[in-house]
Amino acid sequence: MAHFYLIRHGEPTYDNLLEYGFFGFGRDLAPLTEEGKRQVEITAKDTRLKAAALIVSSPYTRALQTAQIISRETGLRVEVELDLHEWVPDWENHYTTSEESFALAREFTKYRGEYPPGEIFRWETVSHMRVRMRRVADKYAKYDKVIFVGHGMAFRSLTYIEKMSPAEIVECIYEKGQPNCEYSFT
């Protein structure tokens, strides 16, 4: 049984992404704002984090920046896990704005994260997200305490979380083979 500290990345900025031609998956190159960096610096000082064995991060820029700030404070090494990425709003990577991503998230919520029988949408299902998140959790369940830096929607597929604020820590006890949690659509 492992003790995970799930930390959502700090506040990001999506300004100027289109200026660089970044859309779809390219939006995940968004860095933290100055406020986001300050949020993480406060979180990084939380004494609970000192007991962790390592930091495991999503590959997205906002998560990697968050992990780097926490690593600097704790002295822990950072591992990157591709499966720790955020929910995929558009498998075809055609969306260009936050508004379009939010519309896809509303559709995801409307259908409770699963495609109706016979239909396929652009977004990743809760079931798919849960499989990849559990794959990462299972890999690190051998450690006593681990910090995971990632994303709110993805973390909600691993343990019941109503909502996560930027740089918030949610503690989670995890054991391989445990039952799936309820996914919060709030």
Kindly give the residue locations of the regions a language model identified.
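Acidic, low-complexity terminal tails and accessory targeting/binding regions
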Residues: 1-3, 79-80, 85-101, 142, ...
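Active-site-proximal alpha-helix that buttresses catalytic centers in soluble enzyme cores
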Residues: 2-79
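Generic beta-sheet signal
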Residues: 4, 144-152
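Short, active-site-adjacent cap segments at secondary-structure transitions
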Residues: 13, 63-64, 86-88, 154-156
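Phosphate-handling substructures
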Residues: 26-31, 72-131, 182
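Glycine-rich phosphate-binding loop signature in dinucleotide/nucleotide-binding domains
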Residues: 48-51, 140-144
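Short, well-ordered beta-to-alpha junction loops that form the rim of enzyme active sites
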Residues: 57-61, 83, 149-153
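A short, acidic, amphipathic alpha-helical segment used as a generic capping/interface helix at domain edges
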Residues: 129-141
